[in-house]
Design a protein with these regions (language model features):
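Compositionally biased, intrinsically disordered low-complexity regions
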Residues: 16, 117, 144-147
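Cofactor-cradling patches in redox/metallo enzymes
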Residues: 30-40, 44-117, 122-131, 136
């Protein structure tokens, strides 16, 4: 099996740190998103659920993430996504990461309101959006696909 797998070229589209925000125990949707992103060639660092924004930023820096994706399944925890955007701005790290938000109560309007770079409706959309954002970032920086 290992021999067969070694013939399959690995596409490294980039690194994504995923987390369900502090105060939110929901994990299933984020797990599905993680699986679909991995299948599409992303390196996914899944931090789990109830993750404070400071920890999300710390891990994103540690893994040199291209994208930070946060999930909020409760309207009461959506403010954590906003808190992350504020932290990124305050620390001067906003330009270092692409941010994506998702979760049942989230919308494109919410993403725009809090300053997130993108919103994804579901796991399939997350892959499409992530690929598009990585390609746009590569064009801006003059770099091609990561190898």
């Amino acid at each position: 099996d290992d021999e067969k797998n070694s013939e399959i070229p690995f596409i490294n589209r980039g690194t994504i740190v995923l987390a369900t925000v502090a105060g939110d125990v929901h994990d299933i949707g984020k797990g599905i998103v993680a699986s679909t992103l991995k299948s599409a060639g992303f390196r996914v660092i899944d931090l789990g659920n109830e993750v404070p924004v400071e920890k999300i930023l710390e891990e994103a820096k540690r893994y040199n993430a291209d994208i930070i994706g946060t999930s909020a399944l409760l309207t009461s925890t959506m403010s954590e996504q906003k808190k992350l955007e504020k932290l990124l701005a305050e620390t001067g790290e906003k330009a270092s990461f692409i941010t994506m938000v998702g979760g049942a109560p989230c919308t494109q309007r919410w993403a725009k309101k809090i300053g997130a770079d993108a919103y994804s409706e579901d796991a399939i959309d997350a892959v499409r959006v992530a690929i598009t954002l990585i390609e746009e970032k590569a064009k801006k920086s003059g770099k091609g696909d990561k190898k």
